[in-house]
From Swiss-Prot:
<feature type="region of interest" description="Alpha-3">
    <location>
        <begin position="207"/>
        <end position="298"/>
    </location>
</feature>
<feature type="topological domain" description="Extracellular">
    <location>
        <begin position="25"/>
        <end position="309"/>
    </location>
</feature>
<dbReference type="GO" id="GO:0042605">
    <property type="term" value="F:peptide antigen binding"/>
</dbReference>
<feature type="binding site">
    <location>
        <position position="167"/>
    </location>
    <ligand>
        <name>a peptide antigen</name>
    </ligand>
</feature>
<feature type="region of interest" description="VL9 epitope">
    <location>
        <begin position="3"/>
        <end position="11"/>
    </location>
</feature>
<dbReference type="GO" id="GO:0000139">
    <property type="term" value="C:Golgi membrane"/>
</dbReference>
<dbReference type="GO" id="GO:0031901">
    <property type="term" value="C:early endosome membrane"/>
</dbReference>
<dbReference type="InterPro" id="IPR037055">
    <property type="entry name" value="MHC_I-like_Ag-recog_sf"/>
</dbReference>
<dbReference type="GO" id="GO:0030667">
    <property type="term" value="C:secretory granule membrane"/>
</dbReference>
<dbReference type="GO" id="GO:0005102">
    <property type="term" value="F:signaling receptor binding"/>
</dbReference>
<feature type="binding site">
    <location>
        <position position="183"/>
    </location>
    <ligand>
        <name>a peptide antigen</name>
    </ligand>
</feature>
<dbReference type="GO" id="GO:0046977">
    <property type="term" value="F:TAP binding"/>
</dbReference>
<dbReference type="GO" id="GO:0016020">
    <property type="term" value="C:membrane"/>
</dbReference>
<keyword id="KW-0472">Membrane</keyword>
<dbReference type="GO" id="GO:0032655">
    <property type="term" value="P:regulation of interleukin-12 production"/>
</dbReference>
<feature type="binding site">
    <location>
        <position position="195"/>
    </location>
    <ligand>
        <name>a peptide antigen</name>
    </ligand>
</feature>
<feature type="binding site">
    <location>
        <position position="176"/>
    </location>
    <ligand>
        <name>a peptide antigen</name>
    </ligand>
</feature>
Amino acid sequence: MLVMAPRTVLLLLSAALALTETWAGSHSMRYFYTSVSRPGRGEPRFISVGYVDDTQFVRFDSDAASPREEPRAPWIEQEGPEYWDRNTQIYKAQAQTDRESLRNLRGYYNQSEAGSHTLQSMYGCDVGPDGRLLRGHDQYAYDGKDYIALNEDLRSWTAADTAAQITQRKWEAAREAEQRRAYLEGECVEWLRRYLENGKDKLERADPPKTHVTHHPISDHEATLRCWALGFYPAEITLTWQRDGEDQTQDTELVETRPAGDRTFQKWAAVVVPSGEEQRYTCHVQHEGLPKPLTLRWEPSSQSTVPIVGIVAGLAVLAVVVIGAVVAAVMCRRKSSGGKGGSYSQAACSDSAQGSDVSLTA
């Protein structure tokens, strides 16, 4: 069954963080933990990354030459040595907890010691414009499949299978949900509000997308129109194609929003159109950085390959970012969350990072 690692006691924030500030829209904080076993090649690798909204701000990698939590955003660098020391110790303890969990999970599923397995967890909270909690998250996955998750009421668990029910019974007996709820309703919100205040110049910004439409002949009879949105923040954006004013959702190829490597995002949407009918199609772009939605058409005279080169370079940067992060969403299905930044949140509670009190261990 699962065993509980000792919960790390976190310093509470000062009363100066009383609910006085307000922010535009909702905001989120997420921590993603990933542990990957590698039989015959040493201890499992443990990686943690933290996000506020769509911005990664901290990272820890047990494979680093000197494993330590590192800043990934300028506004977090102002935290003092105690912050980094405390979080580093939390992550090292969590790495050990996850090692035990991986061993037990292998037993739950009757798996051999030869294969590599992945344990992922995500936790965090969403706050509204008034800085109050909208929703908390605490979820786990094993080998890319849901394992157990804290329900929206923050009082009960949902187990994905019979193995996870072992964990569920253990946590219910230990009243683990109460501890998670206390963190999510308290410290998680307080730390998120602190980060929003310290990083407001970056986190509250709204960089509008740079947009254009490109034309790619397929044959004598068809061509692809691709609508590009580049360099925008935050990540939430809407791209739609219309033909004579009617939405072409079913016929649109839409890629997921992807990081550009410079703390902004990219996205495109494409439709295949009959040659000669390109001007009947319009691309519509909505983003909070735009004073009003944009409507674009392909302009034959302005066709250029330069933006495409920029995209290719950006995607190359993206590949490096993704490989380096090995974040929790590698094999976990993303769960939808209310608020910016998506979700798949875990019980590590310190952001300082809270150490997950749970190890999936017997």
